């Protein structure tokens, strides 16, 4: 991979979000709450119970000729649309123009910026239009989507709240019965597209051995059945879970590449594509011999407005940037 180029701007790194703390509560509620999430997790695993919703049956997608993936958008519609246009996914009106392409967005559409509603509406519209054209949109949950379902608003901007009509209206819309809450609770946390694993943070072997269908079923079940306060106790949404884990992006490659290989072997996959950890250089980060690619390049203006997308066609992997394309693997 070529040396990183300097970004157009040099914003000061923002504090990395931390997993939401467990909320203090009376000991009886702590027992019932924490135990509820724990028992639900282990009952699902032990008895292979599929409570609603049933997982997406085509979590492994074998048909696409072209895959495009884009990382964290964080409330910035203008830069998000610019990246989608640059990658040949949408036109200036936000309409699907990618034909049979499979487009994956790896989560964190919300927080840090004001354009939450516009961005989720864009994803809805592109999803519908892609199907008509023979393509597919795969939107995945990020930690910030789940934080908002937990009613953890540490990174929500005043402009975002105002766009929903106030905090209480925002809570209602994000809730299990709100239009946005219902929509997001159908999203998966992990997808396998032709042997490339896509997710937000990173899939540690601890979770990879569960299998993708189980992870997606558990996530959707928790989000559709547990109240916000109980989501804090779900191990899947914890610091080493698929939404929060940063090891593949940050840890010493001499150690973490072995961990990555174990996870990929468990899934019979050859590559992992993740977001979550901003690359303020504006360049896609390749590690472990191109077996993991970090595509959070700081698209939102709060991180510098760096624009990049990942394109995979067969064995050829390319970073798509403004005015240039750089081959990562072939």
State what each model feature region is.
Residues 2-330:
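Feature recognizes metal-dependent phosphohydrolase scaffolds
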């Amino acid at each position: 991979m070529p040396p990183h180029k300097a970004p157009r701007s040099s914003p000061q790194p923002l504090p990395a979000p931390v997993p939401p703390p467990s909320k203090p509560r009376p000991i009886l509620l702590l027992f019932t709450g924490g135990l509820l999430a724990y028992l639900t997790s282990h009952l699902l695993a032990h008895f292979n119970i599929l409570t609603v919703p049933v997982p997406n049956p085509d979590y492994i997608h074998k048909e696409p000729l072209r895959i495009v993936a884009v990382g964290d958008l964080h409330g910035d519609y203008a830069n998000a649309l610019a990246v989608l246009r640059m990658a040949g996914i949408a036109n200036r009106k936000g309409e699907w123009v990618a034909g049979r392409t499979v487009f994956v967005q790896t989560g964190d559409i919300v927080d840090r910026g004001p354009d939450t509603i516009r961005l989720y509406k864009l994803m809805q519209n592109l999803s519908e239009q892609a199907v008509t054209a023979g393509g597919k949109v795969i939107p995945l949950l990020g930690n910030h989507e789940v934080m908002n379902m937990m009613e953890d608003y540490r990174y929500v901007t005043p402009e975002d709240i105002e766009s929903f009509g106030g905090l209480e209206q925002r809570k209602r819309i994000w809730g299990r019965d709100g239009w946005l809450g219902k929509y997001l609770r159908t999203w998966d946390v992990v997808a396998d597209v032709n042997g490339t694993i896509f997710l937000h943070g990173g899939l540690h072997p601890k979770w990879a051995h569960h299998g993708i269908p189980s992870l997606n079923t558990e996530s959707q079940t928790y989000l559709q059945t547990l109240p916000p306060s109980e989501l804090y106790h779900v191990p899947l949404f914890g610091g080493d879970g698929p939404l929060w884990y940063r090891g593949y992006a940050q840890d010493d490659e001499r150690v973490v590449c072995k961990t990555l290989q174990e996870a990929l072997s468990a899934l019979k996959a050859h590559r992992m594509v993740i977001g979550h950890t901003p690359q303020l250089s504006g360049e896609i980060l390749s590690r472990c011999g191109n077996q993991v690619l970090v595509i959070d390049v700081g698209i939102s203006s709060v991180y510098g407005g760096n624009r990049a997308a990942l394109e995979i066609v067969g064995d050829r992997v390319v970073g798509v940037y403004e005015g240039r394309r750089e081959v990562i693997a072939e």
